[in-house]
Amino acid sequence: VADKVAAAKSVLLLVHGIIGDTDGIVEGLKLATDADGKSVDQKFDLVLTYDYENLSTPISETAVLLKKQLAAAGLHAEDDKRLTLIVHSMGGLVSRWFIEREAGNKVVDHLVMFGTPNVGSPFGKIDAARQLSGVLTTLAINTFPAIAPYGGALVYLLNRSKKISPTLEQMNPTSEFIQTLNASADPGIPYTIVAGDIRDYHESADQLMAKLIAKVGRGIVFDTLYQDAGHDIAVSDDSICGIANDRTPAPTKQNVICHHLNYFVSEAGLKAMAALF
């Protein structure tokens, strides 16, 4: 990896979330194309992925491990590379901790977050976590089989335990982790935030999701969690877009009509990603 990094000028790093791995993001890069047919991955000299244990290891520890692995690969404060991160869900919290608490702002040039719970998620509370993980796993089994085992493992863990996992606990809006992260100084690098909203969801190729929304998404579970606010099932749009606008540069924020698991396959998600590069 270090040899490839040494030969590259522009590097893209992908970081997954609480459910799934980076394979889905990689495929999304290839599907997101500009007017000339050039895909996002083709706009970088090198694409790297960071897969990590995402249930038991505290997010801050994962961020420190990320810093060490990047440095070992030749990505550090003194390098001559342009490093962009595309991250999903909890991967954004890992990346933000690295950038804002571990001097990663000297390494990263641009952070792009999809569905990141920047000020917390209902996943941080056991009852809500059980309900949401059940919905997401049902969706994954029927539409994204490759990531279904990750969701299944999460459901199994939550149903057998009276407590949530350490990483889910850190996503509670009142957790010390969330409070500390959002008290960080301005990192001084561009952040781009993409927030899914299922309220007007109509993806023609995703009939299962339409049925789920009709049965559950507009029912008592989500009404209790989000009231009338926009959300991508797992996270409210207010949380995804919860980074203050008084930073320099101010974070760029946009809403897309998709859910938490199809940012990288839905028409709206792919269009948003293609437009960023």
Predicted ranges, named:
Residues 15-17, 88, 116, 196:
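Glycine-rich His-Gly loop
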Residues 1-38, 42-51, 59, 68-74, ...:
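Flexible, membrane-associating and regulatory peripheral segments of lipid-active enzymes
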Residues 70, 98-99:
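A conserved amphipathic alpha-helix that caps or lines the catalytic cleft of carbohydrate-
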Residues 22-23, 57, 95, 103, ...:
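Short N-terminal helix/helix-N-cap motif within the alpha/beta-hydrolase-1
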Residues 100-277:
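Helical cap/lid subdomain of alpha/beta-hydrolase-fold lipid enzymes
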